């Protein structure tokens, strides 16, 4: 699928930009979706997955992407990113939502409102197990070691089936 090929090649895209989330949002959560894309010369150069959330708990919002830590615009071209944001704003106005929420990995606009509800930690996984343990802050490392002592383990699964 063209969308996912673009997502896999775009440095600003995340797992949550993948096309499969559209079905999850629509079929599982029953949210109307607006998966926008931009293209130049027949090639996708930006995507923006959106879902319209209307609920007593979460209010009336257009979100990229609900129940995901990331979303927002993923683009290889600034003009494409701006066009996708503008279209999202038009859709938000047409739907009459209370707010439009774009969950970018890094803020795109300093003058847009933001919430600092979540924090992300990223660290490269080193080949040596102990080096990875030492990269974890002391208190958290003690909690990890306690989990391991109590039988916590991790496995690498070659597939999702």
Predicted segments with their positions:
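N-acyltransferase acceptor-side catalytic subdomain
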Residues: 1-161
